[in-house]
Amino acid sequence: MALLVGCGEDQEPERARAFWDRIQTEDYRSWERAPGYPERSPSRAAHGDMVDIYVNDVVTQDLASPTRLDEWSDGAVIVKDGYEDGELCFVAAMSKEDGEWFWVEYDGEGDTLYSGQPNLCTGCHSLGDDSVRAFFLP
């Protein structure tokens, strides 16, 4: 069983609730899948034993860039559904706005567990390309 590690604390509950409503309205599961994750895939990270990862059109456009990017564009959204033993346990999402990432993790029912920029999120994600660890900048 994989260890589920959360991001620390719920720093921005109202923003997290609005973000949940937004990704539900946009039907994030209809978005493109992240590179390397064409279907539910095993995870070696802290977010469950299996994951589905979705990216919005801003990330899709960045990935298609013919030139090397140093960072993801504002408006980028990445959503990861995390599963343990086949059951949706949480939804982890990140959104880039004004050059800063906002992280949020919800339980399987959509209740906020963590939000904002908690140290556990930023500490782990700082190792990725502009804070994204699942795939690389083009």
Model-derived regions: residue spans:
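His/Cys-centered metal/cofactor-coordination and adjacent catalytic loops
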Residues: 55
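Sequence context surrounding c-type heme c attachment/ligation sites in exported
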Residues: 8-48, 58, 63-138
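C-terminal motif of bacterial Sec signal peptides marking the signal peptidase cleavage site
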Residues: 4-6
